[in-house]
Design a protein with these regions (language model features):
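Perimembrane helix-loop junctions in membrane proteins
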Residues: 25, 29, 72, 76, ...
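Secretory targeting signals
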Residues: 1-22, 46-119, 149-168
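Terminal transmembrane helical anchor/hairpin motif
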Residues: 1-2, 115-191
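Helix-loop-helix units of permease transmembrane domains in multi-pass membrane transporters
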Residues: 22-54
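Conformational gate/switch positions in structured elements
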Residues: 40, 111-112, 172
Length: 191
């Protein structure tokens, strides 16, 4: 559980600040010109960024979670394997949601603004959700909570699965938005 708290704050901070300029920085420094003159679709361009960042984030998170699992078993006792993988799988969907927010904001805004909006969406909405979240149980921002519930029992199945569905729909919506913004902002590329 302590590892989750660290991932939720420092991990999200690293993800957002590390990748907020993924697309916007290429527009600003002129590298985007080399890409936009090629016959490549904006969907391919956006998804290539999303896949690479998602892979880096998921591999990093899984290495950290597997290490934590190993040391927890050594020091404190057995953690059920099925519960651990349900926890890690749920948390992976949350990580992909965060990555999608960051890349979509980078396609839309300059680097500083993309980082700010991404941090507000990821961290501030989580704080609001923790304060007022008792009034709604289906939200992408609930996934980290549902992930930890796999280790302490199991989350309410209906709310959990609806949150997964809503998150996947939000990911698709953010990808569509990011592709559209990549196309719209291509003309802002410096030469």
């Amino acid at each position: 559980m302590a590892t989750m708290g660290q991932y939720q704050f420092f991990g999200m901070l690293v993800l957002v600040l590390g990748f907020a300029g993924t697309i916007s920085r290429e527009r600003k420094n002129g590298t985007g010109t080399l890409i936009y003159v090629r016959p490549i679709s904006y969907l391919s361009y956006f998804l290539s960024k999303w896949k690479v960042i998602g892979t880096i984030a998921l591999v990093s998170v899984w290495l950290g979670l597997l290490t934590t699992w190993y040391y927890t078993e050594l020091l404190f006792g057995k953690v059920d394997t099925a519960d651990f993988f349900a926890f890690a799988g749920t948390y992976s969907v949350w990580i992909l949601f965060v990555v999608t927010i960051v890349v979509a904001m980078s396609a839309w805004l300059p680097t500083g603004a993309a980082a700010t909006v991404s941090l507000l969406l990821v961290l501030l909405v989580q704080i609001v959700d923790s304060l007022l979240g008792a009034y709604w149980t289906i939200s992408p921002w609930k996934l980290a909570i549902y992930a930890t519930q796999w280790l302490t029992g199991s989350p309410d199945a209906t709310n959990f699965w609806w949150s997964i569905v809503v998150t996947l729909i939000a990911i698709v919506g953010l990808v569509v938005f990011g592709v559209w913004m990549s196309k719209r902002n291509a003309s802002k590329t410096k030469i």
